[in-house]
Design a protein with these regions (language model features):
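Membrane-interface alpha helices of multi-pass inner-membrane proteins
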Residues: 243-258, 290-296
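Start-transfer (signal-anchor) and selected internal transmembrane alpha helices
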Residues: 1-4, 25-91, 522, 568-574, ...
């Protein structure tokens, strides 16, 4: 049944990502949904069989190199594979040096230099992006100016250091899998995980990017390991004060480096007290969540506000999806709106209702909703009008949401990459037969914002343009090579592999334990909340690399979850306490 549901979702998402409607639900749709569902069932069963295969336990003394490696202290066992991974990443690091500046990063740095961005007054810092990221990137630029007379120099060093640190962290993830899983299978899973992290170029390409999401990943990876250990030991890991303090520190840093990271981190921490454990242990977990929320939502904002001129934005980002639905309603039913509803919409949004149909872009909310609201006090009135209109024509809302978020579920997408205007539905239908595969798209060349271009010492980095073209060619090779290109599909990471994890959870022995366990797989909470957070984004189809940037955390989180699942001990997850070696 799960595979059939997945087939229906993918078929509907393919329609939404190519023609901006879920239907038509005709015979072709049924055949495609059944075909995808059957294929997924076969693949999932094969994957399950591979995961259940007993790993071979080899005697260490038969491999002298392995024996010497295992005799090393922990630091050696961590750094030696990290050096191997870094050596494999080095060619990409070289061709992408000095790192990619993203559009948003340029705005953040420009603000640190007192240049106006996002319509905010010059000299102020906008809260449109996480303040910690702005402080980090701006301080690095200032450091480069002070030490080398060029702000780009410190950012280039930062990009390389970011890659080095990530190699160490990913190696630590592999060592953790090898330590906590069943003997034999755990080592095989760890080796497979290490090979993926080492050879798949998406990770190193992204880590050579200077952007808030790559900084976030630096804290997310070790936080995931601590979260998994806390869940695996049924909260007993929190008995260690050093572990608990480190967990809180990483939770705070993970939460402060992306907007969605704040909610994902705190909501995940709130799941830990639900674990079947002692009352004292649950209180410790609740304390971790409470302290993290207090620091990230009250202490840090107050401290930054006292030190810098921060311009706090209204909550326009919370209305991205509702306003996109309103725009689709304006396109489908322009005459079926009351004067009161029209006034409520026009009061809140800069784009009036009468212009929404023309500006509507099925795969991008930016043309409809701006960086701010016209009158934030009218949000309540707007939401009431929005609800009434949705009850009147729910089909428009469903198609608007499906099109906007279809990129997380679809295998195909429209070949159009237009972002500076609205797109008519007849345009999409006219080129639906040229649909392209929905693949991860990277920002490799610099994306320079107008504010960043105004910096007096800014100069385009053309010296490395030839090398960066080789980075594009490398990713193009992976996108076009049979078998390898499957790994470049967005939906593989944001829907299909998570669906496989759910498939494993519902199958024996997990299925029999769901009634007895509060959280049979508590360590999956970050994955669940992260996936749900994707559904509030203003773009999912990669018309521009921003869409792919939102999901690149999945390239670490999903393989980590798969490795834990493949190497889990034979004891039930209800008895995982005490599994550590």
């Amino acid at each position: 049944m799960l595979c059939l549901v997945c087939g229906v979702v993918v078929a509907g998402a393919d329609n939404a990502a190519t023609v901006a409607t879920l239907g038509p639900f005709d015979a072709r749709f049924v055949v495609r949904a059944l075909g995808i569902g059957l294929l997924l069932l076969v693949v999932f069963l094969i994957g399950e069989r591979l995961m259940k295969a007993p790993g071979k336990t080899r005697r260490v003394d038969t491999f002298p190199v392995l024996e010497r490696y295992r005799s090393l202290p922990f630091a050696g066992r961590l750094l030696v594979p990290s050096a191997v991974m870094l050596a494999c990443w080095t060619p990409v690091i070289v061709i992408m040096y000095p790192g990619t500046i993203w559009y948003d990063t340029g705005d953040q740095i420009a603000q640190w230099y007192g240049i106006e961005a996002y319509g905010q007054p010059a000299g102020s810092i906008s809260s449109h992006h996480p303040l910690l990221d702005t402080i980090v990137f701006g301080s690095l630029a200032r450091l480069g100016d002070a030490l080398a007379g060029d702000y780009r120099s410190a950012l280039a060093v930062y990009a390389v250091v970011q890659c080095v640190v990530m190699c160490v962290e990913l190696t630590g993830v592999c060592l953790y899998v090898a330590r906590v899983g069943r003997e034999g299978a755990a080592h095989m899973a760890a080796v497979a995980l290490f090979a993926f992290f080492t050879l798949f170029p998406a990770l190193v390409i992204f880590m050579m990017s200077i952007v808030k999401d790559s900084l976030h990943l630096l804290f997310l990876v070790p936080w995931l390991v601590l979260f998994a250990e806390t869940a695996r030991t049924r909260l007993e890991a929190l008995h260690s004060p050093r572990f608990a303090v480190g967990f809180v520190a990483l939770s705070v840093l993970t939460a402060l480096t992306t907007m969605t990271g704040l909610y994902v981190t705190i909501l995940s921490l709130c799941c830990l007290p639900l674990t079947r454990a002692g009352r004292a242990d649950r209180l410790r977990a609740l304390a971790v969540a409470s302290v993290t929320a207090l620091i990230t939502m009250m202490v840090f904002p107050a401290a930054v506000r006292s030190a810098f001129d921060v311009e706090y934005e209204d909550q326009n980002q919370l209305l991205v999806v509702p306003m996109q639905m309103t725009a689709r309603y304006a396109l489908d039913h322009p005459g079926d709106v009351t004067d009161t509803e029209r006034a409520a919409i026009d009061r809140v949004n800069h784009v009036p209702f009468e212009d929404m149909a023309f500006r509507y872009h099925p795969y991008l909310a930016d043309p409809v909703i701006q960086y701010s609201l016209r009158d934030p006090s009218g949000v309540g009135e707007y939401l009431r009008a929005w609800a009434v209109m949705g009850l009147r024509h729910p089909d428009s809302y469903a198609n608007a949401f499906a099109a906007l978020e279809s990129g997380w579920f679809s295998l195909q997408r429209t070949p159009m990459n237009v972002t500076d205007r609205g797109i008519r539905l007849d345009e999409l239908r006219g080129i639906a037969g040229q649909a392209a595969a929905n693949r991860i798209r990277f920002q490799i060349a610099d994306a320079i914002s107008p504010a960043f271009a105004r910096m007096t010492r800014y100069h385009a980095n053309n010296a490395n343009s030839a090398s960066r073209s080789r980075a594009y060619a490398l990713w193009g090779f992976w996108q076009s090579t049979p078998v390898l290109r499957v790994l470049t599909l967005t939906a593989l990471w944001t829907f299909l592999l998570p669906a496989f994890l759910l498939f494993r959870l519902l199958r024996p022995p997990y299925g029999r334990m769901l009634a007895r366990c509060a959280l049979p797989a508590a360590y999956a909470a970050p994955l669940v909340w992260s996936l749900l957070s994707l559904l509030a984004n203003a773009i999912s189809v990669p018309l521009k690399p921003t869409a792919s940037r939102y999901m690149l955390w999945a390239l670490v989180v999903v393989p980590f979850m798969l490795a834990l699942c493949a190497s889990e001990r034979s004891e039930s997850t209800c008895q995982m306490k005490g599994n550590s070696r």
